[in-house]
């Protein structure tokens, strides 16, 4: 992948288009903010699409000190500006958790640009259970620092049997996450933006086709949140994975990738046919 030449916008990683005028798919990760979250999807997506991934502002190769009132709307605006600076004006969005919120904001604020939205373990507004999970994680962060946050994170992302079979991998991932930790203040400001977001009054204004993917065994975000999202979005379809946890695209990429590829192809065709 090459880095966007824009010096004024966030850095983006773009795959070469597989053919002329190939559709663009933008991948938006969750609270961790790292574009590398989507590694299990890149090889299959870039055969059919030009793929954009990036480290969100305040994380990875887009370091910054975030304002206390940092918001989902700001996340959407800075991403759209970076895409336009890279010459991309129309794109599909695949967002995981916080990334799904950014995707909905993009669909509301830039409806002429967002062709299709895929929400992975997303929600309209934060569920009481999810809020409780984050309260526990925040307490760990305040009492034990970055290491406690990083060590607890897999418990909320992955199924227990998947973790038990991959202890060395989790240790390596934990060390990497700690080395590239986004910083306590940035993390809390991004988390507060997530907790404040509420699309319950505006979801019916999202007119692009939406694919909703959720995992029934997600510990962090109950699958009922995706059912609420499906009911609120006028043009949506919902797929439920029986296994995979919150990071189902990582733990069961074969199932997830098949759902994603079929959904993108169908919804992009549906969108073009409607124009």
Curated annotation (Swiss-Prot):
Q: Say which enzyme class the record assigns.
A: hydrolase
What Pfam families does the annotation carry? Abhydrolase_1 (PF00561)
Question: Where is coiled-coil annotated?
Answer: none
User: Which BP terms does GO give this entry?
Assistant: nitrogen utilization; uracil catabolic process
Catalytically driven reaction(s): carbamate + 2 H(+) = NH4(+) + CO2
Enzyme Commission number, as recorded: 3.5.1.-
Keyword annotations for this protein?
Answer: Hydrolase
User: Which terms does the record give in the GO molecular function aspect?
Assistant: hydrolase activity, acting on carbon-nitrogen (but not peptide) bonds, in linear amides
UniProt lists the family membership as follows: Belongs to the AB hydrolase superfamily. Hydrolase RutD family.
PANTHER family in the cross-refs: MONOACYLGLYCEROL LIPASE
Task performed by this protein: Involved in pyrimidine catabolism. May facilitate the hydrolysis of carbamate, a reaction that can also occur spontaneously.
Q: Give the protein name, as stated in the record.
A: Putative carbamate hydrolase RutD
